């Protein structure tokens, strides 16, 4: 037990040191004091746009410094409790200390990752699209496994999810789906997950039990809020309505409530059929279009735009971000960071935090 406690303490202290440097705690505290003084000014709202920007920065610094100080304080309390438990030889309290430190270690690691979020949309909700690659039923099944993996990942992070659009495969799985992920920093946590995912396994659809390779792609884009301006001209849009697909039965949609919007200049398409109201589906599809166009613009500002565009359109060997091998051995490996794990079951159940952290750290390092 003592060894486990020391290990958790070491991890937390390492996270705190990285956070101290990443946040530049002393400078951030001075800036927060300055912002608090500015926020108290009676002239604050003379310039509404600047006031909103100032208050967002103030709120962000308060949250970051508050979380950092809380982790420090909780670690101090746990160490004091451990010292008391050792002096009294109280095993029950020692077990509680270990449990508390384990939880604090997880919180510190998550906060450490979130400090790598630097994009203007990283705090926003996001949309996740999954598309099956070539290969029919096998790829359709893999796309449905990926959908579950990301739904579980979102659940682990405390996010809410909403399936906006889904097209089922003929025999099994899905051809495609769009998921709205709702929660603070959802886009920050998901943005590095865009690309092609390769699965190697013994196919449950092959009578001979052959090992098969399947591909599916994911694309992530942020939901646009009032802080980000995206202008779309009506003349650039084509809006189509159609009957929503479904399994039939009592609630089958018998009206043309599903909506598809095409942005003619870019060829970008969004569609929504999650609601029985055509008006609500149109509003959601327009929101998705704004998000896609924003993401396309952000991609144009990066040197890797060609690679990213290919990753979302070409489900092939050359544009993979991650491989999932279930046979003849078990291994999930990120091809960008080389991070890997043999816990394939955990990964497919949504345990993706380490993969995301490694990708964000690599991206942060490449910008220095």
Swiss-Prot record:
PROSITE patterns linked: RF_PROK_I
Chain positions with N5-methylglutamine modification: 250
MF terms in GO: translation release factor activity, codon specific
Short name of one Pfam family: PCRF
Domain of life: Bacteria
Modified how: Methylated by PrmC. Methylation increases the termination efficiency of RF2.
SMART domains: PCRF
Predominant subcellular localization, coarse grouping: cytoplasm
Location in the cell: Cytoplasm
Gene Ontology cellular component terms for the protein in this record: cytoplasm
Alphabetically ordered keywords of this record: Cytoplasm, Methylation, Protein biosynthesis
Family: Belongs to the prokaryotic/mitochondrial release factor family.
HAMAP family, alphabetized: Rel_fac_2 (MF_00094)
Protein role: Peptide chain release factor 2 directs the termination of translation in response to the peptide chain termination codons UGA and UAA.
Identification of the protein by name: Peptide chain release factor 2
The organism of origin for this protein: Rickettsia bellii (strain RML369-C)
Gene: prfB
């Amino acid at each position: 037990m003592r060894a486990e406690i020391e290990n958790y303490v070491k991890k937390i202290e390492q996270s705190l040191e990285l956070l101290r440097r990443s946040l530049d705690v002393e400078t951030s505290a001075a800036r927060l004091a300055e912002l608090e003084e500015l926020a108290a000014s009676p002239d604050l709202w003379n310039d509404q746009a600047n006031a909103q920007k100032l208050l967002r920065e103030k709120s962000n610094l308060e949250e970051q410094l508050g979380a950092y100080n809380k982790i420090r304080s909780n670690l101090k309390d746990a160490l004091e409790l451990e010292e008391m438990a050792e002096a009294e030889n109280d095993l029950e309290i020692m077990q509680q200390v270990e449990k508390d430190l384990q939880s604090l270690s997880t919180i510190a690691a998550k906060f450490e990752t979130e400090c790598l979020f630097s994009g203007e949309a990283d705090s926003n909700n996001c949309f996740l699209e999954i598309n099956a690659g070539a290969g029919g039923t096998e790829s359709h099944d893999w796309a449905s496994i990926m959908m579950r993996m990301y739904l579980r990942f979102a659940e682990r992070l405390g996010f809410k999810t909403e399936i906006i659009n889904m097209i089922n495969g003929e025999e099994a799985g899905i051809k495609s789906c769009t998921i709205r992920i709702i929660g603070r920093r959802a886009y920050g946590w998901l943005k590095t997950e865009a690309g092609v995912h390769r699965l190697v396994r013994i196919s449950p659809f092959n009578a001979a039990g052959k090992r098969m390779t399947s591909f599916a792609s994911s694309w992530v884009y942020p939901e646009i809020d009032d802080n980000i301006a995206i202008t779309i001209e009506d003349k650039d849009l084509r809006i189509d309505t159609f009957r929503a697909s479904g399994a039939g039965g009592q609630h089958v949609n018998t009206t043309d409530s599903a909506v598809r919007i095409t942005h003619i200049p870019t060829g970008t398409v969004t569609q929504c059929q999650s609601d029985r109201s055509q008006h609500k589906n149109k509003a959601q599809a327009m929101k998705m279009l704004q998000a896609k166009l924003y993401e396309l613009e952000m991609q144009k500002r990066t040197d890797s735009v060609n690679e990213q565009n290919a990753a979302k359109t070409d489900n092939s060997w050359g544009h993979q971000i991650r491989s999932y091998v279930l046979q003849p051995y078990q291994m999930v490996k990120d091809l960008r960071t080389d991070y890997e794990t043999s816990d394939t079951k955990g990964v497919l159940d949504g345990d993706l935090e380490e993969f995301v952290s490694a990708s964000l750290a690599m991206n942060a390092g490449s910008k220095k």
